[in-house]
Amino acid sequence: MKRLISCLTIICALNASAAAETTSSPCSRWISFLKPVCQRIHQTWTEGHDDMYFSGYAWHNRYTYRPEKIKSYNEAAWGGGLGKSLFDEKGNWHGLYAIAFLDSHRHIEPAVGYAYLKTASVNKDIKAGLGYSVLITSRVDYDNVPFPGALPWVALFYKRTTVAATYIPGSAGAGNVLYILGKISL
């Protein structure tokens, strides 16, 4: 519960900081080479659609874990969250999110982040995307200390619904998890 409150506090602080900036130059205090990052995040936050995230599956790579270890892991990564997202002028997707889900040990793991996907349209209603996510998360097995991460991200968009996945790399017995989540744009 403390992690969820911390996550929500971070989001509120970022929102308050964004609200304090003037609308004519929301990123005026940023270092010049980071201004495009700030401007895209600001655009996503102010112009993006509201999203509801839900998660449900975390597949542990059978080639890197012993069968008895896999049996002890939770692969039902139930959870959810909220976000904002938009398709930019080139048709690529940008998203901000805050989620919490059950990790491999059935502990709640919160995460806040930004994701970018280069997309290709299959037809009017279907798009596929490939990109990355940068995030901050915390885990019980790391003493709940927040730490940053960057992960690959793929998604299939159909109208207002999305199925996405990321692969958390690792070594033998750690990481190597395919995490699948969904999103509905409200």
Curated annotation (Swiss-Prot):
Signal peptide: 1-18
Principal EC category: transferase
Keywords: Acyltransferase, Cell outer membrane, Membrane, Signal, Transferase
EC number: 2.3.1.251
Site entry (Role in lipopolysaccharide recognition), positions: 69
Gene3D superfamilies tied to this protein: 2.40.160.20
Xref: Pfam families: PagP
Swiss-Prot/TrEMBL catalytic activity: a lipid A + a 1,2-diacyl-sn-glycero-3-phosphocholine = a hepta-acyl lipid A + a 2-acyl-sn-glycero-3-phosphocholine; a lipid IVA + a 1,2-diacyl-sn-glycero-3-phosphocholine = a lipid IVB + a 2-acyl-sn-glycero-3-phosphocholine; a lipid IIA + a 1,2-diacyl-sn-glycero-3-phosphocholine = a lipid IIB + a 2-acyl-sn-glycero-3-phosphocholine
GO cellular component: cell outer membrane
Assembly behavior: Homodimer.
Record-stated family: Belongs to the lipid A palmitoyltransferase family.
Protein name: Lipid A acyltransferase PagP
Encoding gene, per UniProt annotation: pagP
